[in-house]
């Protein structure tokens, strides 16, 4: 009906407040429980704890709010396509969806979003093997981040008990819903900040749908796990389930119980392995000692033989020394005799010897020895020396 087809008297009149209340009532009565599919955008989390966001499709946008304390199975994240359950309310002449429940929609888009995130973090080097920390051989203290209730924690504790009893510290968290990823992040940081931190951390939850496991695809959680100083083992879902934290963790276990088997050795097997290795060590030591003993005996034999040879050489050297000394004395005696003969011969030609036996020595006027008659001439003066004195004489002819 158009305004022209009715008289103004037939049109009801409302105040602003009345029409606002009427629209609010109509909205509430008509859309008191609805589902809206859309993509999350404009996400805001003020300190009040409420969550404000928009849901959009290709053509339209609607505001939405989730009041603090509302428990949801899915974590808010920009870009997620979701189906929200709730009611329409009006606020300051605007309408909005009050979210009371939410599930993920469009798993194909979720898978594409997950792969895009994985490639982004992989490109940053967050998953590089060089960043991975080795697990301790036998952790004395194990931190477990999981729900404090349910089968997972019971399975873990039971497996630890039967495998190798260790000190377990459980950090209780939600493993599903909008608060799950933030709680796991705080748990990892909390373990790292303890004065006596655990030797290894297991992050675990049971299997579930992609929506149930989605908190473990959170980017902040992946970065926190990669930055942990304590080695982290992820055990999320079943063997076929893969989440982002599996790539960021140091080790991925297919199940929570498998995580315990990776972290802890089986006690009896460990004892058996140690005994076997000790046996091998003892055998190796015996072999080494036997070889060394054999070598020492060889060296002792060589040393004894060498000692005998040295003794023989010593005796031979002593004999040679005595022979050399004897030959040296004989040679020295011969040389002494030769020298004595030589001295005797020299003495026979000595002036004093010649004079002493009655001969005389003649000198010319210059004092030179005259050994020939031709060395002097008539009228030359000469000196004649006998053993008892000298006399001058003249050559007459």
UniProtKB/Swiss-Prot annotation:
Please state which protein family the record places this protein in: Belongs to the XseA family.
Which keywords accompany this UniProt record?
Answer: Cytoplasm, Exonuclease, Hydrolase, Nuclease
InterPro entries hit by this protein: Exonuc_VII_L, Exonuc_VII_lsu_C, OB-fold_nuc-bd_dom
Among PANTHER family, the record links this protein to: EXODEOXYRIBONUCLEASE 7 LARGE SUBUNIT (PTHR30008:SF0)
Q: From the Swiss-Prot or TrEMBL record, what is one GO molecular function term?
A: exodeoxyribonuclease VII activity
Biological process (GO), any one: DNA catabolic process
Write out the GO cellular component annotations: cytoplasm; exodeoxyribonuclease VII complex
Q: What class of enzyme is it?
A: hydrolase
- In the Enzyme Commission scheme, what number(s) does this protein have? 3.1.11.6
Lineage of origin: Bacteria, Pseudomonadati, Pseudomonadota, Alphaproteobacteria, Rickettsiales
Superkingdom is Bacteria
Quaternary structure (record): Heterooligomer composed of large and small subunits.
Q: What is this protein called?
A: Exodeoxyribonuclease 7 large subunit
Q: Where in the cell is it found?
A: Cytoplasm
Does the UniProt entry include the keyword Phosphoprotein?
no
């Amino acid at each position: 009906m158009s305004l022209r087809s009715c008289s103004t008297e037939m049109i009801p009149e409302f105040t602003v407040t009345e029409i606002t209340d009427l629209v609010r009532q109509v909205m509430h009565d008509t859309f008191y429980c609805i589902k809206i599919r859309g993509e999350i955008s404009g996400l805001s989390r003020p300190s009040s704890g409420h969550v404000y966001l928009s849901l959009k499709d290709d053509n339209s946008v609607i505001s939405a709010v989730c009041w603090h304390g509302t428990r949801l199975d899915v974590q808010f994240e920009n870009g997620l396509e979701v189906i929200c359950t709730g009611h329409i309310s009006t606020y300051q002449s605007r309408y909005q969806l009050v979210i009371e429940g939410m599930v993920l929609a469009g798993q194909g888009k979720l898978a594409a979003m997950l792969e895009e995130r994985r490639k982004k973090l992989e490109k940053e080097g967050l998953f590089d093997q060089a960043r991975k920390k080795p697990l301790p051989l036998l952790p004395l203290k194990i931190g477990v981040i999981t729900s404090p209730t349910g089968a997972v924690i019971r399975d873990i504790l039971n497996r630890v008990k039967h495998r190798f009893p260790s000190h377990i510290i459980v950090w209780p968290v939600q493993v599903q819903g909008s608060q799950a990823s933030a709680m796991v992040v705080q748990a990892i940081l909390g373990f790292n900040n303890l004065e006596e931190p655990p030797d290894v951390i297991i992050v675990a939850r049971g299997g579930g749908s992609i929506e149930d496991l989605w908190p473990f695809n959170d980017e902040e959680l992946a970065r926190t796990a990669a930055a942990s100083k304590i080695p982290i083992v992820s055990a999320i879902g079943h063997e076929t389930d893969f989440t982002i934290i599996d790539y960021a963790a140091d080790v991925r276990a297919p199940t929570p119980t498998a995580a315990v088997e990776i972290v802890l050795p089986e006690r009896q097997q460990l004892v058996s392995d140690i005994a076997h290795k000790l046996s091998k060590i003892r055998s190796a030591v015996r072999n080494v000692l036997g070889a060394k003993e054999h070598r020492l005996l060889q060296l002792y034999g060589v040393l004894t033989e060498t000692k005998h040879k040295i003794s023989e050489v010593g005796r031979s050297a002593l004999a040679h020394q005595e022979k050399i000394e004897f030959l040296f004395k004989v040679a020295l005696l011969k040389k002494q005799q030769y020298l004595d003969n030589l001295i005797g011969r020299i003495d026979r030609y000595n002036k004093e010897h010649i004079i002493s036996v009655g001969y005389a020595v003649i000198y010319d006027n210059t004092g030179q020895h005259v050994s020939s008659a031709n060395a002097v001439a008539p009228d030359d003066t000469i000196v004649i020396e006998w053993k008892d004195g000298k006399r001058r004489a003249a050559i007459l002819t």
